Amino acid sequence: MCESIEWGKIMTDLTERLDMMEAAIKKPGFRKSAGRANEVNYWLFDYPPENELEVRERIARLKAENESGANDFTLAVFDLYDIIIDFLENKNFIEKCFDFEKKKGFERITQAVSNPMKFKDDDSIIVKHLKDNTPDNAIVFLTGIGKCYPIHRSHKVLNNLHQAFVKAPVVMFFPVY
């Protein structure tokens, strides 16, 4: 189940929304499944694309603070774009992708990339990466959603995570108008 939280309401001040999100994730109850059916916590944090750098800076600060041992949880930050690029590089697909796009077009390359990454499957490369790299007692931040579009769409990530990934609350950050 994907839910919103009071910091997801429309507010004019992004800094205030980020402050509210930061306070919320630091509460012990945030890491507990507390819904009607004891579902995992999935949260969406949308922001105007022009505020991307401010959001990135806040996430970096939170991660650095967390790495210093300031919290009683681990903050696991994953950039979905970086996961996709790393996969393509490890398989030596990057140059092939560039050539394929030149010959067949962008729409065809998005389809071609989604097949080996299993974007539509519960065992997608992204879900597997998140499962393998998320420690116990963690909060997961998903970033890079805007950079992946339209190759990978955020709802596919959430659908796949909902089926296969239940050990940590997930906060997905994505730019939206």
Residue ranges and their predicted role:
Residues 135-151:
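Conserved P-loop NTPase "ATPase switch" module shared by AAA+ and STAND
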Residues 80-84, 146, 173-177:
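Short beta-alpha junction loops
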Residues 122-134:
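Mid-core helix/loop region of P-loop NTP-binding domains shared across ATPases and GTPases
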Residues 149-165:
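Conserved Walker B catalytic segment
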Residues 49-54, 83-85, 116-121, 146-150:
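Short acidic, S/G/P-rich loop/turn micro-motifs used as interaction or catalytic elements
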Residues 162-177:
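Short, flexible loop segments at boundaries between secondary-structure elements
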Residues 75-123:
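Long, charge-dense
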Residues 12-67, 75:
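Glycine-rich P-loop/Walker A and Walker A-like loops and their local beta1-loop-alpha1 context
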